[in-house]
Regions:
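Short acidic, flexible loop segments centered on an aromatic residue
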Residues: 45-68, 104-107
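Acidic, contiguous N-terminal accessory segments
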Residues: 18-33, 81-85, 97-215, 449-461, ...
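Active-site neighborhood of glycoside hydrolase catalytic domains
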Residues: 366-473
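Intrinsically disordered, low-complexity Pro/Gly/Ser/Thr-rich segments with frequent PxxP/GP/PP motifs
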Residues: 64-95
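Sec-dependent N-terminal signal peptides
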Residues: 4-14
Length: 604
């Protein structure tokens, strides 16, 4: 008995003393050549194991310790030569902000469960710069009808109504609210959208209601918000909360980015691998093969399910439509297609059916995409590509019909096809084949397409005219060279909410197109652009987001600037005066609501 007790005690002591693998990452200062020497220390890692982590795509040069190997996208790994502590020093770029540091460290051992590793960060002190704080004044004396988006015209008591003389006819979304001395509102509207917007306005007006007449309408028919759920998945309930925010800003289109390199986020019942494989994430096997799931996305999560069932999707559609919001889902093609390519390879392995093949096994193209993938482009010359997307289009059409909501368009992406794709074939001819193939699908089904500006450039005149006839809109960064197409303004420098608020290292986000805050979004001026502008849209890419708190932080308050520019296309007074009023409304009317709901937002 005593020996048994001692044995148990010894085993417990061994377990208690066993060290858990962990990591320390130390930021290095910038050197004269523009690089920085960073240090990564891995503690208590077993010999022969492999440590995976995620870091924004960037070349690295090791100067001490084992090599760091790039896999695909943001994934890197280190093979551990001996047990204990392993130190790596490597040259990379200087760290612009803390969120760019390596993250999601996972220990991989043969025959054992994967182990997430604790990471401790040691960042340099960075002096504050002028960009950390903008000029944000909120001393404008508000009147009762000052809300966001700002109303087109208002009359208090017996004051004359302004701007009505510029309204030649009542546009879609028009409404009028008349509030008498008793505070009882009467609403007139052009359509169901206008009736809903009137209700939103009434909910925002301070109580008790004062006598006034409001006449209001949107300057643009399209007012959108793009949500990327591919790189950092959002639950159904979180999407519904985002829709509520959109509705409160009188936005009317959710551009739902649900298929890209990193994940395929919608159930398609004919192809279970799209979600069984393409919406699950796991470390590659020891031979670096993705045998049962895709590699982790930038957030490093493994074992997670990142898709919407058909029932969940229709729930989102109905919820949005009840708030007068249309949903346009995007399946990014022909680049940004890695998730579907890998998933359909798994489908072919299971079924032996190659008739839906998305990538030619004989293709020897060598390319490097903007997000560091080498295998993410569709073989657009294969008829099987269009057979596959015909099935996808049919299912999306069916789901919208089942939900009883309109299908404005299907967004086909079309951006960032890397140079080197389709080696040995004429790139211009490949684009012609792709656009005409997608148009065949759309025309046969009586639906419209949408896409990023790349799809409209460099086409033959006949293809260009054909595209115009089946196109709802294209998202444009710049309207140059896009003559004759309906466009939705989506310039990165004004509408990409994932870009950091400032260069402060604590901010999350990228900065490749500069910094975007509520001053920048409010400054979007449609008069600076030519062409058939039907609206504006805010974009929220999610490669830097890790939580719903990150989502609302990047939306609030800068998303309001884009919403304002969708409803009111410009400002009729000096910018600082207009922005002072706008920001004063945010502080007085919007911030208390966010605080009451517990949303994370940018505080100043």
């Amino acid at each position: 008995m005593r020996k048994t007790f001692l044995l148990i005690a010894t085993l417990l002591l061994i377990v208690a003393c066993k060290r858990v693998p962990s990591a320390d990452w130390t930021e290095g200062p910038a050197e004269p050549d523009g690089r920085a020497l960073h240090t990564l220390v891995l503690h208590d890692v077993p010999q022969g194991s492999r440590v995976w982590f995620q870091e924004l795509f960037d070349g690295k040069t090791s100067v001490e310790g084992p090599a760091m190997h790039h896999y695909q996208g943001t994934s890197w790994y280190v093979d551990i030569p001996e047990s204990g502590t392993v130190t790596l020093k490597y040259y990379g770029r200087p760290l612009p902000r803390h969120s760019w540091a390596p993250e999601a460290f996972i220990l991989q051992q043969k025959g054992r469960p994967h182990t997430p590793m604790e990471v401790r960060y040691h960042f340099l002190e960075h002096p504050k710069t002028e960009n950390d704080e903008g000029s944000f004044v909120s001393d404008y004396e508000l009147r009762p009808a000052d809300i966001i988006p700002q109303v087109s015209a208002v009359k208090y008591g017996n004051e004359p109504m302004e701007r009505i003389d510029i309204l030649p006819s009542r546009p879609e979304g028009w409404y009028r609210i008349t509030i008498g001395e008793e505070g009882e509102p009467q609403v007139e509207s052009y359509d169901a959208d206008g009736a809903f917007y009137a209700q939103v306005t009434l909910e925002k007006l301070p109580q008790p209601l004062q006598p006034m007449t409001i006449e209001d309408w949107p300057d643009y028919a399209y007012r959108g918000f793009m949500l990327d759920v591919v790189r950092d998945f959002r639950t159904v309930d979180e999407v519904l909360e985002i829709i509520d925010l959109m509705a409160s800003w009188k936005l009317n289109t959710l551009h739902f980015h649900i298929a890209d390199d990193e994940s395929w986020c919608l159930e398609i019942k004919d192809f279970p691998e799209l979600t069984d494989f393409g919406a699950h994430h796991a470390l590659p096997d020891w031979n670096l093969q993705e045998t049962s799931a895709l590699k982790p996305t930038a957030n490093g999560q493994i074992g997670n399910v990142t898709f919407y069932t058909a029932e969940e999707y229709t729930r989102i559609l109905r919820y949005a439509w009840d708030r007068r919001i249309r949903v346009i889902s995007e399946f990014d093609t022909p680049g940004h297609s890695r998730a579907s390519i890998k998933a359909m390879q798994a489908y072919e392995r299971r079924t032996g059916d190659s008739s839906f093949r998305l990538q030619d096994p004989a293709d020897t193209s060598r390319y490097w995409s903007a997000q560091d993938f080498t295998d993410n482009v569709l073989s657009v010359y294969l008829p099987s590509v269009y057979k596959f997307y015909g099935k996808v289009f049919d299912e999306v059409i069916r789901l919208h019909k089942e939900a009883g909501v309109p299908l404005p368009a299907i967004h086909i992406g079309g951006d960032e096809v890397p140079e080197g794709a389709w080696s040995g074939r004429n790139r211009h001819e490949m684009k012609e084949i792709f656009i005409n193939g997608m148009l065949d699908l759309a025309e046969a089904r009586g639906i419209l397409l949408a896409g990023w500006e790349d799809i409209a450039k460099g086409l033959e005149p006949e293809t260009q005219e054909r595209l115009k006839n089946s196109l709802y809109f294209i998202n444009v960064w710049n309207t140059e060279g896009i003559e004759g197409f309906p466009v939705v303004l989506s310039p990165a420098a004004y509408t990409y909410l994932d870009l950091a608020y400032s260069d402060a290292p604590e901010e999350i986000g990228l900065h490749w197109a500069g910094y975007v805050d509520e001053r920048k979004t409010f400054a979007l001026n449609s008069n600076d652009y030519k062409g058939d502008i039907i609206g504006v849209q805010a974009q929220l890419w999610s490669s830097q987001l890790r939580s719903f708190e990150d989502v609302t932080y990047q939306m609030l308050p800068k998303g309001l600037g884009v919403a304002e520019r969708g409803w009111n296309g410009g400002y009729l007074e000096p910018f600082e005066t207009a922005f002072n009023r706008f920001y004063s409304i945010i502080v007085a009317r919007e911030v208390p609501v966010w605080e009451q709901k517990g949303y994370a937002f940018k505080k100043r």
